[in-house]
């Protein structure tokens, strides 16, 4: 009989000549990949362990399985190279039977995450961790066994097709891939059949009458099919009977009923562990996502662990699965995109949670839309349909991609990543973008694959503004976005970027080096930011009330604004036990509360309550703002001379002035240069240039400078210059 031996212990890790014992999962970038500076180690390290030859009967095979080695792996056994794998997120296997010696064997895995031009990803806003960060298993199988393919493909493939929704009739095709067997016995839901093996495959078809459907969060029911060989070898596989449809006007449809996909994206790493996470950590992530009420996850930007896909199957989350073909097309990387897509599909085919295969993410951010790029996407699209005719393809497009681009015609459904109201522009430009797209292409399905605003929960403000990294502005941002999305059910899927803060070692902003802080939950999973509860109010069926601002204790304003999120229809607010006001409404409740000292503020809704403590302060708490924004309260040296230009004037009008325009252009050009590829793409895109010009019509010079990340002293200095330039009368 076959057996699986876990090989996670007994490894020696070697980096630059230094040895240390490690247990898998392991990454060498758990610290330096999260601390900023963009200087984390990218190179080749090795993992070595002794491997005792297992007891093998005649015809038995020994197969090593690696579930995740980042980014390139070379496997050597007793000095002989037995395998090489390019891609850091998928499973690969190697048959080592003929390379094994009696007794002890030396297994060395060389792992490389260095910069190159052939293996994706190479350019993106997240850390490319190196290491063996998922399980390693030795499979010992008899001569007749279920196939353990090198590309990690499932040995039993299940294709359910709901042929009659009204009757809940589901036709289930089961294919078993075997070696050395003549037939396979299949069992499903009390039905049994036997099928002969032809060219390594046995195939059977079952019909389930009145099937129990896999119905998302409401009832994620899973069937189990069992395949058995005559020698007793058995393989069990879970699957779900469900029907996915995507309609340009109705959005996502599950089993015949509208089911708008509203949820989050997830990166797999976490503080202190990097990508070397445990199943318990995955379960914690899932519990947080479910608490918020999300019904979909975009598993970005690569293949995630099988254990997490299993959780999604069990809990009823609908999944967008994708490969790390991201940001920048590489001429020498075409083959790698196809390999990673093949592995993604053949390894995850049976998961009922997966609805779409993602071809790429923001691939035009640093690449031109040329024939080579288009051909690569066509090849990926064709491969996905060949390997899986049952699921549509999609891609996440960067905001500056024109909606008339030919690349949008390749996948079955599309989606856009937009950051209006954070990186650029105003919040209502998100509304305008999708309304324009939907009006121009009413027969195309469109989704919202990324949107978000960074928030450091230490930063708070009574006057939140774009670019201040406050938890308060993140709430303002998401309040607009949540309502905008709720008003547009034809958006087939929307995914907040991101559920959790994650490592991006090149970042140095918002008071935390090395982190992207757009998460609704902190990197260590310890703090649910206030915006988490906004989406809970929109999505969750579990009644609750949440008072925002628990970390905004010291307040200088005489009358403070208190925001409350709840999915209940009525909220009452109390100060020190006395009723302030009762409001009816939905999701967001705003109260104005006079404060004079230390107060307890409590929101009550039904049987639920939430309390925060506030303190009337005479001076702003400097810990509530970034150091370059602590003097923002007064940008001016004195009263403004209205006959001269100032940072309070309209940006478009100022740019049009012969004297002021060149001064501002020099500043905006400098800011654009600092943003590199993205800014260059905007400059070369007429549609985005026009969009920016429209944004300037509504922005002040001050607003544009803050958006560009200018510090307080620079803005004050510019205001002094502008106050010396008279306006033409």
Where are these regions (language model features)?
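Compact, charge-rich alpha-helical regulatory domains located at protein termini
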Residues: 635-728
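Secreted/periplasmic carbohydrate-active enzymes, especially glycoside hydrolases
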Residues: 1-301, 316-319, 340-343, 350-356, ...
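Long, contiguous interaction/targeting segments characteristic
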Residues: 63, 69-143, 463-537, 667, ...
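In a subset of proteins, long, contiguous C-terminal domains/tails are tracked
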Residues: 532, 537-540, 575-576, 600-636, ...
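Substrate-binding/catalytic cleft of secreted carbohydrate-active enzymes
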Residues: 173, 286-289, 296-527, 531-538, ...
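Intrinsically disordered, low-complexity coil segments
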Residues: 142-168, 230, 509-512, 526, ...
